């Protein structure tokens, strides 16, 4: 089972390095260093994985812009829970719950697509007892 937080962290680092060239610029309206360096130095996903995740993020934007903005602020721009809580006018606990909901939606979209990401070998989470997900075991056995 893939760890969606690690997946989104890698996607966020990819997006922060401006591979999309769509939404944000590293230098906008005279503000240098809009994207913090700590975000740029993280491990990234490949372009193919990023395009799949961008599709999920775009669908989330269409259906729930608040959750989309929360994911972008946290994973791309690297804002903290406290900064997000001030921005959204709620507690950091509330931000954690909203972020968890947004992560779950993206994870569900990836599951429904049934795609295997290149980064899965790095972000796979073990289930209790040292087993991997049954979903991946079945999928791999069908390919053999």
Curated annotation (Swiss-Prot):
InterPro entries on file: Phage_933W_GpQ
Keywords: DNA-binding, Transcription, Transcription regulation, Transcription termination
A Pfam family reported for this protein in Swiss-Prot or TrEMBL: Phage_antitermQ
One Gene Ontology term of the molecular function aspect: DNA binding
An individual GO BP term: DNA-templated transcription termination
Entry similarity comment: Belongs to the phage antitermination Q type 1 family.
Biological function: Positively regulates expression of some phage genes. Bacterial host RNA polymerase modified by antitermination proteins transcribes through termination sites that otherwise prevent expression of the regulated genes.
Protein name listed in UniProt: Antitermination protein Q
Name of the encoding gene: Q
